[in-house]
Swiss-Prot record:
It comes from the Viruses. Homotetramer. Interacts with protein M2-1; the interaction between the two tetramers is required for the anti-termination and elongation transcriptional activities of protein M2-1. Interacts with host phosphatase PP1; this interaction recruits PP1 to the inclusion bodies. Formation of a complex PP1/M2-1/P allows P to target host PP1 phosphatase to the M2-1 substrate. Interacts (via C-terminus) with the nucleoprotein N (via N-terminus); the phosphorylated phosphoprotein P binds to N-RNA complex. Interacts (via N-terminus) with the monomeric RNA-free nucleoprotein N. This is Phosphoprotein. One of its GO terms (molecular function) is RNA-directed RNA polymerase activity. Residues 232-241 are annotated as: Binding to the N-RNA complex. The keyword Phosphoprotein applies. Its main location: virion. Residues 216-232 are annotated as: Binding to RNA-directed RNA polymerase L. Keywords: Host cytoplasm, Host-virus interaction, Inhibition of host NF-kappa-B by virus, Phosphoprotein, Viral RNA replication, Virion. Plays critical roles in regulating RNA replication and transcription through its interactions with multiple proteins. Tethers the RNA-directed RNA polymerase L to the nucleoprotein-RNA complex. Recruits the M2-1 protein, a processivity factor that is required for efficient transcription of viral RNA. Acts as a chaperone for neo-synthesized nucleoprotein by forming an N-P complex that preserves N in a monomeric and RNA-free state and prevents the association of nascent N with host cell RNAs. Recruits the host phosphatase PP1 to inclusion bodies to regulate viral transcription. Changing I46V: In strain: ATCC 51908.
Length: 241
């Protein structure tokens, strides 16, 4: 037969229940828990008592949404656009001694025929008259340079060794410039002689030709045009030969 727990009824059941609860109270209650409790937190219908020694502190943290953060950053940032090109302010003419020289140089090389004594057509024109004119201009510039150096030498002449050194340096510079201009003139003369020699050689070849039709070769025509035609502005190149 199966055994069943005894059943209690009436006053007897009440007495047994009271004794059972008192026995449980003695087992789960200590002397330390007899102190006054500060607060009770209710979580899912379970009562938890907190002692006085363990206070609970709460802090509030505000978490911004990403859109709010972006708006705040955009509002706080100030975008300053840098210029693509920066220009230096020019010094006043009183403080910059090279302003006048700079302006004169620009005016000389800005294709202004009144200021510049050389043009592209004149440089490429290798006729006799043009080369002679260029040599005349070289001589004129050389005279100006010599006069300027002579003036500086006289101005710097003196008893001190420093002034003597300046004078010697200027004289050496003058001689160097004279030599450069002289070499340029010699190169021009050599070129004219070479062109004349080539023309003569082409002419001799044509005189030896026994064919009925006599005409100049392309090279001879080129040389003849350069040496005799004053209006020609053609130049020779290595491909012509």
């Amino acid at each position: 037969m199966e055994k069943f727990a005894p059943e209690f009824h009436g006053e007897d059941a009440n007495t047994k229940a009271t004794k059972f609860l008192e026995s449980l109270k003695g087992k789960f209650t200590s002397s330390k828990d007899s102190r006054k409790k500060d607060s009770i937190i209710s979580v899912n219908s379970i009562d938890i008592e907190l002692p006085k020694e363990s206070p609970i502190t709460s802090t509030n943290h505000n978490i911004n949404q990403p859109s709010e953060i972006n708006d705040t950053i955009a509002a706080n940032q100030v975008h300053i656009r840098k210029p693509l090109v920066s220009f230096k302010e020019e010094l006043p003419s009183s403080e910059n001694p090279f302003t006048k020289l700079y302006k004169e140089t620009i005016e000389t090389f800005d294709n202004n025929e009144e200021e510049s004594s050389y043009s592209y057509d004149e440089i490429n024109d290798q006729t006799n008259d043009n080369i002679t004119a260029r040599l005349d201009r070289i001589d004129e510039k050389l005279s100006e340079i010599i006069g300027m150096l002579h003036t500086l030498v006289v101005a710097s002449a003196g008893p001190t060794a420093a002034r003597d050194g300046i004078r010697d340096a200027m004289v050496g510079l003058r001689e160097e410039m004279i030599e450069k201009i002289r070499s340029e003139a010699l190169m021009t003369n050599d070129r004219l002689e070479a062109m004349a020699r080539l023309r003569d050689e082409e002419s001799e070849k044509m005189t030896k030709d026994t064919s009925d039709e006599v005409k100049l070769t392309p090279t001879s025509e080129k040389l003849n045009m350069v040496l005799e035609d004053e209006s020609s502005d053609n130049d020779l190149s290595l491909e012509d030969f």
